[in-house]
Amino acid sequence: MQKRLTLLGSTGSIGDSTLDVVARHPERFAVHALTAHRNGEKLVAQCLRFAPDVAVVGDAETAARVEAQLRAAGSRTQVAYGKQALVDVSKSDGCDTVVAAIVGAAGLAPSLAAARAGKRILLANKEALVMSGAIFMDAVRDHGAILLPVDSEHNAIFQCMPRDAAEHGGIAKIIVTASGGPFRTREPATLASVTPDEACKHPNWVMGRKISVDSATMMNKGLEVIEAHWLFGLPSERIDVLIHPQSVIHSLVSYRDGSVLAQLGNPDMRTPIAHALAFPERVDAGVAQLDLAQIATLTFEKPDYARFPCLALAIDALEAGGVASAALNAANEIAVDAFLSRRIRFTAIAQTVGAVLDGLSNRTPGGLDDVIEADAAARRAATAFIGKLPAPGVERAA
């Protein structure tokens, strides 16, 4: 039976890769809804190619522009806008599968709506679990949703794990691999001077600018540790991080009998996307077969927490529980935006997140409202902290 998709965040890198796979298998996949924030031009092009029932954008002005272009081209795709429209297409009877690829906290509400509607969810938005892990997983369980990880690391772990629960599968630990990003070997004393463009030049993966910066700080890997905790039910002490610069081994599962299973492949997001889209079957993703003889060497090293303080901060937040992970994510989003806007130095990202966590009044969230409140409070605290920092290139007066 043909799967009908709602693709949240269709104009981003995950959206591009998803639609590439979808286009290869029109007999298997059809598109119910595509969503974007403000990239109307790209969304129009996608709508004309994939003919979704609905297109959703962030605001009325973009919606009017998109609708005018679609009507001029003869498209019947309906156009909606705003947060509620995202929720509506995520729980719509017109789709059975939701690809959650909106970057950041904005993806939480529609992803949660999909879970509560019992959808098959392909989760690329890690913030849904980072911010509200227990709430989200409860919704998945209580409403019979199917959750399939799209992040390459978590998809790899999923492929290497038995289908039963971790505690009954003889699992000792899971090992999340990381490339180390563009600054793995850079002298730490020079990190304060790196530019946004340098931070966004990932050595292996093609990604958006926000997640590229998260990779450079290794906050992305910290968020993935938190996500792995909720997806696979393992405590932080049974989740290791391993630097693997070639990005060929996407993650590993270590068993109590000494066996280690790993998932390998070329660094191309179409592979985990195709796996999740077609699961439990396999389909062509358009990705070249891995040639280990050509690669020849795979190397590994332990992460340097002094070089990557954001990784340590994320693990600390996971162990603290409560709303600490939500605060971590919110502060990081504010700090990364400030860095990309050249308002703070690269090294101030970790400083900002650390300051927000130090000032956090942690508590166990009673529901989604508590998570949203913690998110907002952390954003205010991060903004206030950044406001007191000197601009890049400006030293404080003695």
Curated annotation (Swiss-Prot):
Family annotation (Pfam families): DXP_redisom_C (PF08436), DXP_reductoisom (PF02670), DXPR_C (PF13288)
Q: Which purpose does this protein serve, as stated in its record?
A: Catalyzes the NADPH-dependent rearrangement and reduction of 1-deoxy-D-xylulose-5-phosphate (DXP) to 2-C-methyl-D-erythritol 4-phosphate (MEP).
- Reactions the enzyme catalyzes: 2-C-methyl-D-erythritol 4-phosphate + NADP(+) = 1-deoxy-D-xylulose 5-phosphate + NADPH + H(+)
Q: What is its EC number?
A: 1.1.1.267
Residues annotated as binding Mn(2+) are D151, E153, E224
Q: Which domain of life is it from?
A: Bacteria
Quick one: a GO biological-process term for this protein? Answer: isopentenyl diphosphate biosynthetic process, methylerythritol 4-phosphate pathway involved in terpenoid biosynthetic process
Pathway stated in the Swiss-Prot or TrEMBL entry: Isoprenoid biosynthesis; isopentenyl diphosphate biosynthesis via DXP pathway; isopentenyl diphosphate from 1-deoxy-D-xylulose 5-phosphate: step 1/6
Family according to the record: Belongs to the DXR family.
Protein name, UniProt field: 1-deoxy-D-xylulose 5-phosphate reductoisomerase
Show the InterPro entries listed in the entry. DXP_reductoisomerase (IPR003821), DXP_reductoisomerase_C (IPR013644), DXP_reductoisomerase_N (IPR013512), DXPR_C (IPR026877), DXPR_C_sf (IPR036169), NAD(P)-bd_dom_sf (IPR036291)
Q: Where does NADPH bind?
A: T11, G12, S13, I14, R38, N39, N125, E127, G208
Cofactor requirement? Mg(2+); Mn(2+)
Taxonomic lineage from the root: Bacteria, Pseudomonadati, Pseudomonadota, Betaproteobacteria, Burkholderiales
| Keywords tagged on the record | Isoprene biosynthesis, Manganese, Metal-binding, NADP, Oxidoreductase
Q: Which PANTHER family match?
A: 1-DEOXY-D-XYLULOSE 5-PHOSPHATE REDUCTOISOMERASE, 1-DEOXY-D-XYLULOSE 5-PHOSPHATE REDUCTOISOMERASE, CHLOROPLASTIC
Positions that bind 1-deoxy-D-xylulose 5-phosphate: K126, S152, E153, S179, H202, S215, N220, K221, E224
One GO MF term: manganese ion binding
Identify the gene encoding this protein. Answer: dxr
